Amino acid sequence: MEPSLATGGSETTRLVSARDRSSAGGGLRLKSLFTEPSEPLPEEPKLEGMAFHHCHKDPVPQSGLSPERVQARRQLYAACAVCFIFMAGEVVGGYLAHSLAIMTDAAHLLADIGSMLASLFSLWLSTRPATRTMTFGWHRSETLGALASVVSLWIVTGILLYLAFLRLLHSDYHIEAGAMLLTASIAVCANLLMAFVLHQTGAPHSHGSTGAEYAPLEEGHGYPMSLGNTSVRAAFVHVLGDLLQSFGVLAASILIYFKPQYKVADPISTFLFSICALGSTAPTLRDVLLVLMEGAPRSVEFEPVRDTLLSVPGVRATHDLHLWALTLTYHVASAHLAIDSTADPEAVLAEASSRLYSRFGFSSCTLQVEQYQPEMAQCLRCQEPSQA
């Protein structure tokens, strides 16, 4: 076998057999793999596949929303409308019933509306191309929207906690138990309706919980779920939490309706549900801060990515490895690969990129290939980051 490299990055290996040598009168008869497919060599699909996505996960960006995202947008529109109508009803009902527990439930619905609006906004912005000013596009608008939703919920919840504390100090307040019971019953029905609207039949199954409420990722290696799926699933998780809180408010209203002397259940339930509401925003706030601080994606660890790059044939060392999340569903990686002098830079680049895309689902990878130098082992700038 005599391999030869042709221009254009393709390999044209030809076979030479003893039988061909004798039949040709001492000369060589070259048999091309491209003209005689009866003796093919093993193909390397990974290297060939990289021609279609040389530096991106997707070969060609979509010009509009996919059918899945269109369906997700419809679900979010419907759920947002239902949520807004019943939130307004809870505000009115809570005011008429003088119930802080109802108002707390309405505040939680306000956070849900903000989360769904952020998801809808991100779905719309995902179709806008990057510009020379916004070179990464508008992806982080979703993160900013989630941050605004969390801040607004904290402000409203803080006000309600202050009012509940005043009610515990001074018991000169009256609860309209009938209006409170009616409003709480309607809130339960509203959350059941939103859960039905957002329920995804045949959604991909996943094990474990990501802790991200507005755009969770699948745990482990592999491609993140699409934005449409994650947005609807996050809203569905929100609604399930609201449903449990609405059942709690309903239980408190039933107690006050039949036992008016236990009206203290209203400020007490306000305290409990406010803590639950603030606690439910903790994963979202953590993910938002991680994205804004250019932190590594929670579903991707540093060591496996480094080891994957070092396992590529020809790679001696890697440095300047950076992993960050542009959003919770858009992961980016960049690294320098120090290779042997005998290694083919194009082959190393293609293989390393292919492994990063297939194993970790990065949306964009930037790899710089350079010759290995012994001085790299002592270079302070080439050392790995600390564990913290």
Curated annotation (Swiss-Prot):
Belongs to the cation diffusion facilitator (CDF) transporter (TC 2.A.4) family. SLC30A subfamily. Probable proton-coupled zinc ion antiporter mediating the import of zinc from cytoplasm into synaptic vesicles and participating to cellular zinc ion homeostasis in the brain. Disulfide bonds: none annotated. The modification Phosphoserine is found at residues 63, 66. Residues 1-41 are annotated as: Disordered. GO terms for cellular component: glutamatergic synapse; hippocampal mossy fiber; hippocampal mossy fiber to CA3 synapse; late endosome membrane; lysosomal membrane; microvesicle; neuron projection; synaptic vesicle membrane. GO terms for molecular function: antiporter activity; metal ion binding; zinc ion transmembrane transporter activity. GO terms for biological process: detoxification of zinc ion; positive regulation of transport; zinc ion import into lysosome; zinc ion import into synaptic vesicle; zinc ion transmembrane transport. It catalyses: Zn(2+)(in) + 2 H(+)(out) = Zn(2+)(out) + 2 H(+)(in). Expression is restricted to brain (at protein level). In the brain, most abundant in hippocampus and cerebral cortex. The mRNA is also detected in testis, expression being restricted to germ cells and highest in pachytene spermatocytes and round spermatids. It is a multi-pass membrane protein. Gene3D superfamilies: Cation efflux protein transmembrane domain. Zn(2+) binds at residues 108, 112, 238, 242. Keywords: Antiport, Cytoplasmic vesicle, Endosome, Ion transport, Lysosome, Membrane, Metal-binding, Phosphoprotein, Synapse, Synaptosome, Transmembrane, Transmembrane helix, Transport, Zinc, Zinc transport. Homodimer. Homodimerization is negligible compared to the human protein. It could explain the lower efficiency of zinc transport. Interacts with TMEM163. Disruption phenotype: Homozygous knockout mice lacking Slc30a3 do not display overt phenotype with morphology, body weight, lifespan, fertility, litter size being normal. Zinc ions are eliminated from synaptic vesicles in brain of the knockout mice and the overall levels of zinc in brain is decreased. NCBIfam families: CDF. This is Probable proton-coupled zinc antiporter SLC30A3.
